[in-house]
Amino acid sequence: MPIDTATKQKIIAEYATKEGDTGSPEVQVALLTHRINQLTEHLKEHKHDHHSRRGLLLLVGRRRRLLQYVAKKDINRYRRLIERLGLRR
């Protein structure tokens, strides 16, 4: 499920560290979190959609690796990010 352009731009603007920032780990994690939330809602309705479930697991793994990278580089930045996203860690 792709993210529509308006939503994507809003997320990028909210989590960007500077103007024109689309690739920072914060932005990437925020976009992945949005996609994960969408897929989670989809799977609540379509419980037997195993292809989407695998995609969800891949997205969660990618987000976990990015969060580990941020935590390794700057622990305060990591804590702010998970607090803003409402992730439980």
Curated annotation (Swiss-Prot):
Keyword terms: Ribonucleoprotein, Ribosomal protein, RNA-binding, rRNA-binding
GO cellular component, one term: cytosolic small ribosomal subunit
CDD domains: Ribosomal_S15p_S13e (cd00353)
Pfam families: Ribosomal_S15 (PF00312)
InterPro entries in UniProt: Ribosomal_uS15, Ribosomal_uS15_bac-type, uS15_NS1_RNA-bd_sf
Gene3D superfamilies: 6.10.250.3130, S15/NS1, RNA-binding
GO molecular function: rRNA binding; structural constituent of ribosome
A GO BP annotation: translation
Family statement drawn from the similarity comment of this UniProt entry: Belongs to the universal ribosomal protein uS15 family.
Subunit structure: Part of the 30S ribosomal subunit. Forms a bridge to the 50S subunit in the 70S ribosome, contacting the 23S rRNA.
Function noted in UniProt: One of the primary rRNA binding proteins, it binds directly to 16S rRNA where it helps nucleate assembly of the platform of the 30S subunit by binding and bridging several RNA helices of the 16S rRNA. Forms an intersubunit bridge (bridge B4) with the 23S rRNA of the 50S subunit in the ribosome.
Cross-referenced NCBIfam families: S15_bact
Name the record gives this protein: Small ribosomal subunit protein uS15
Organism: Thermobifida fusca (strain YX)
Name of the encoding gene: rpsO
